[in-house]
């Protein structure tokens, strides 16, 4: 038995929700370790769809403990709203099945407003990143700047007042620069104290709790959000998120040591998608790209934004295998490729006429690379609902084997529809 870390190996939206749900049924504890309510995922259980943004997937399954780690930035109002939405669907969330790290940073209204003001200004200047405007980046900035307000601060109104007084000069200076009105101390205090009684019952010393769970032999599932190519260090900077999204963050963002992480499962879509701005070497703007988007229902869970679509990029996933230490991948949405006459896989790039085997880190170079493709024959048969290798067309199996060879990691799971049971299991990550 081992613990499992689930990460996205592309730009997010790889289908982590289904795989995490499949794994969480067998886990005891499910931990979120980075990001905030900017990355959504949909779980389909017994025909009911649950859309989660902040809460760990384990929260919808009875008998599981869901944990929001210290690496997550928590919008308390979004948290309360998501809990209420689940309650309306018959899912009860209490401290018996959800704990939040007492040292997790809070997202405030001024973070959301700053995020929006920056995006508006960047849109006008042509430097837009394409954030969700939910205050994630500004909250992380305050965390790194050592002025953040954390979950535990809600329990001490007097100390909270001092911390609000410390954070406001920074934000009001920025707001003046954008021509926005300053924020009053009383506004933020009222905003926070109004949610304190609803948030504080969930607070926990998470590192200690997880250490106890580890010692008793609990199965722990670490649930990543977004994708490795959006990592603040290893992604396509500056078109990235504001946190580390690679597997190593599961340790730092939860308080467990790296030796406890175990199997690293990289969720990998059988083609490539991206939301928002930034480089995308294999992007297709033709009818094939439109086909992938429509058949794959490529619209964001949180924002509803249309995703950009393209061929599978083995060079980028190979980088993710290395930066995450991926043990095996879960290949998703293979069924979306059904019916295409031919398929292409990017194996490297040409940069100024020179062949290279990885995407360069420099933004200007990323904009100039041209993909180098291998072409494979497609298949006409349906792979939807396949649950064993024998159900797959020969060309589909050939495609999967080619992906494995090019990225340097084996397929542990193969997903053939949004339904959780439509999965071919090759290797059980919990038993590896």
From Swiss-Prot:
SMART domains: Adenylsucc_synt (SM00788). Its EC number is 6.3.4.4. GO terms for cellular component: cytoplasm. GO terms for molecular function: adenylosuccinate synthase activity; GTP binding; magnesium ion binding. Pathway: Purine metabolism; AMP biosynthesis via de novo pathway; AMP from IMP: step 1/2. Binds 1 Mg(2+) ion per subunit. It is an enzyme of class 6 (ligase). Pfam families: Adenylsucc_synt (PF00709). GTP binds at residues 12-18, 40-42, 307, 333-335, 415-417. Its cofactor is Mg(2+). Mg(2+) binds at residues 13, 40. GO terms for biological process: 'de novo' AMP biosynthetic process; IMP metabolic process. Substrate binds at residues 301-307. Coiled coil: none annotated. It comes from the Bacteria. Plays an important role in the de novo pathway of purine nucleotide biosynthesis. Catalyzes the first committed step in the biosynthesis of AMP from IMP. Homodimer. Belongs to the adenylosuccinate synthetase family. HAMAP family: Adenylosucc_synth (MF_00011). NCBIfam families: PRK01117.1 (NF002223), purA (TIGR00184). PANTHER family: ADENYLOSUCCINATE SYNTHETASE. This is Adenylosuccinate synthetase.
